[in-house]
Amino acid sequence: MSTQNYFIGIDIGGTKCAVTYGTDKMDILSHYQFATHTEKGPYFAIDEIKKCLAILEKSYDFTQLKSIGISCGGPLNSETGIILSPPNLPGWDDIPIVDIIKKATNKPTFIQNDANSCALAEWRFGAGRGYKNVVFLTFGTGLGAGLILDGKLYAGTNDNAGEVGHIRLNSNGPSGFNKSGSFEGYCSGSGIAKIAQIRAEEKLNIGQKLSYCESYDELQGITTLQLSKLANAGDADALEVFEISAKKLGYGLSVIIDI
């Protein structure tokens, strides 16, 4: 009889979602990924997750599946299993995701803030092994942190102890969480594009152009993907944007370390 433990991991992000089937030995047996498409509402992504689960149930023996873990940006309530209006998931208001997945699979299901989930995983299986204190940053559509303090996950009263994206690094600057100059405003996928938009508008206002934006009409079309491709090709204007973000990342990390 097999003694292997099998699990499903579900990650719900503002840009993409993922569903994996694996073991507690870090063997990933199946992995699915798809765009979240927040403009289509929460149940588009939820239905896609259900489709992935149905495929997995046909492919593997679910009697050996111990449980399902869901990782999602906060705020959320890990005790009730409800997603509570995350900034990067517009329309995901009071979504009982744990109950939905339980009904679809009849398996124990749990949810945790994405940054906390990542911190736990890295602490147990990755670069954080052997350390009593670990900070893990989620640098995606938004920015958050998971905290391992004195050998335990520190989630705080409402699972939001690591929401460092709110830290203000400058009185003015790109917005994150609708707060100008915030850590997330400078250091996130959406924030990097905002830095570029600000720099481009400053140049256009004095009659100059940047490689990634030659007119005011192009300002809102600037994307982080576009900038990363240019930066990888050595474009100086795009590299300047990433340098600004990188310096703020270092500054933000120094604040967390001091705390």
Language model features with spans:
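Adenylate-forming
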Residues: 118-124, 147, 166-168
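A charged helix-plus-loop insertion that forms the helical arch/lid used to bind
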Residues: 82-92
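Structural signature of FAD isoalloxazine-binding scaffolds in flavoprotein oxidoreductases
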Residues: 160-164
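General beta-strand structural signal in soluble alpha/beta enzymes
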Residues: 109-113
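Short hydrophobic alpha-helix segments
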Residues: 32-34, 87, 157
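ATP-binding/phosphotransfer module of carbohydrate and carboxylate kinases, centering on a glycine-rich
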Residues: 1-67, 77-82, 98-108, 121-131, ...
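Short, active-site-adjacent cap segments at secondary-structure transitions
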Residues: 75-78, 117-119, 144
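Short beta-strand segments
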Residues: 11, 69-73, 136-142, 146-148
